[in-house]
A protein has these predicted regions:
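Gly/Pro-rich hinge or "lid" segments in bacterial periplasmic/extracellular proteins
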Residues: 201, 209-267
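Bacterial lipoprotein signal-peptidase II cleavage site
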Residues: 24-33
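Bacterial N-terminal signal peptides that target proteins for export
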Residues: 2-9
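N-terminal lobe/hinge region of extracytoplasmic solute-binding protein
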Residues: 68-119, 149, 241
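Short, well-ordered beta-strand elements
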Residues: 61-71, 122-126, 144-147, 193-194, ...
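Aromatic- and charge-enriched surface segment that lines or borders ligand/interaction sites
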Residues: 113-160
Length: 267
C-alpha cells in the first residue's frame, strides 16, 4: 500500500509542478522552503508552517510536503470544476478518476482496473474489486453511474464536461433533470459499467477526454442532496468520505489547499 500511495503522490506532485495543481499565493507571500518529509500536503504560495511549528513537526515524526504553484484554484467540488489541470489534480487527490496519465504520459488504471471495447462505441469499464470508500463501503458501478448523471444534469450545469457524445444525452450535453439512467451508461453488475457513444471513438479519446475527468462520488453519502445543492454544499469543500489517498483539511481559493493522508486508502 505504501508503495502505491507513494507512486500516486509522486504522480500528483509531478503534475502539480508541471501543470499547476492548486492555488497561488498572494504577492507578499513568503517563499516556501522545502518541507520535512510528510503525511500532510499543502499546495500553496505561502510558507505552511513557522519555524517553531516545523521543529515540532519534525520532532513528532509528521511528514509534510509544500508545493508552490502559479495559478489560483477555482473549486475543489467535482461537480463544478472545469477541465483545467489545476482543478483536476486538486480533486484527484480525494476522488479518483477511472484512469490517469503516469509520469511517462501513458494511461494508468486508477479506480478502474480494465477498460475494453470491441467496436469503439461500447466501452466496458471494470472497477477494481478492492476499491473502497474511506468509510469502508465498496466503490461500485452505481457510484460511477450516479456521478455521470449528476455531472450531466442541467441543474448542475457543468458546461465544460461535455457528455453529448454518449447515447441518451442531449446535444447540449445534458440529461433530463432528475434522470436515474440513460441508454449510454448502463450498469452491468456492481463492479462493471458500460459507456456507449453515438459515434465510434478511439480508446485514447475515451480515456483522455472522459475517463480521466470522471471523478466518482459516493452515492450513498451525497444522494441526499438535491441536484441544485450539489454545487453549493459545503460538504464538497471538506468531504469526510473519499476514495483517494488524501482528504482536505483547510482550503482558501486564492491562497492554499491543505490535505491530510487518508488512513483508510484502499490502494
Amino acid at each position: 500500500m505504501k508503495k502505491r500511495v507513494s507512486k500516486f503522490i509522486s504522480l500528483a506532485l509531478t503534475a502539480a509542478m508541471v501543470l499547476s495543481l492548486a492555488g497561488c499565493g498572494s504577492s507578499d507571500s513568503a517563499e516556501s522552503a522545502p518541507a520535512e518529509s510528510g503525511t500532510e500536503t499543502t499546495a500553496s504560495g505561502e510558507t505552511a508552517n513557522s519555524t517553531e511549528e516545523s521543529t515540532q513537526t519534525a520532532a513528532s515524526g509528521e511528514k509534510i510536503v509544500n508545493i508552490g504553484v502559479t495559478d489560483s484554484l477555482g473549486s475543489i467540488n467535482p461537480f463544478v470544476i472545469d477541465q483545467t489541470f489545476i482543478n483536476k489534480y486538486a480533486v484527484d487527490l480525494q476522488f479518483l478518476p477511472l484512469v490517469e496519465f503516469d509520469e511517462n504520459l501513458n494511461f494508468e488504471y486508477i479506480l478502474a482496473d480494465s477498460i475494453t471495447t470491441e467496436d469503439n462505441k461500447n466501452f466496458i469499464v471494470h472497477i477494481n474489486d478492492d476499491a473502497t470508500w474511506s468509510d469502508g463501503n465498496p466503490i461500485t458501478a452505481y457510484d460511477v453511474e450516479y456521478s455521470f448523471l449528476r455531472l450531466a444534469s442541467p441543474i448542475v450545469a457543468n458546461a465544460t464536461l461535455v457528455y453529448n457524445v454518449f447515447e441518451g444525452v442531449g446535444d447540449d450535453g445534458f440529461v433530463e433533470e432528475g434522470a436515474t439512467g440513460v441508454s449510454g451508461v448502463q450498469v452491468i453488475d456492481d463492479k462493471t459499467i458500460q459507456f456507449t457513444t453515438k459515434e465510434p471513438m478511439s480508446m485514447i479519446t475515451f480515456q483522455s477526454a472522459y475517463a480521466c475527468y470522471l471523478h466518482t462520488m459516493p452515492k450513498h453519502v451525497i444522494e441526499k442532496f438535491s441536484e441544485a445543492e450539489l454545487t453549493t454544499q459545503d460538504w464538497f469543500n471538506h468531504p469526510d468520505v473519499v476514495s483517494g489517498p488524501f482528504m482536505v483539511t483547510d482550503y482558501d481559493t486564492d491562497h492554499y489547499i491543505s490535505y491530510v493522508a487518508n488512513k483508510n486508502y484502499w490502494k
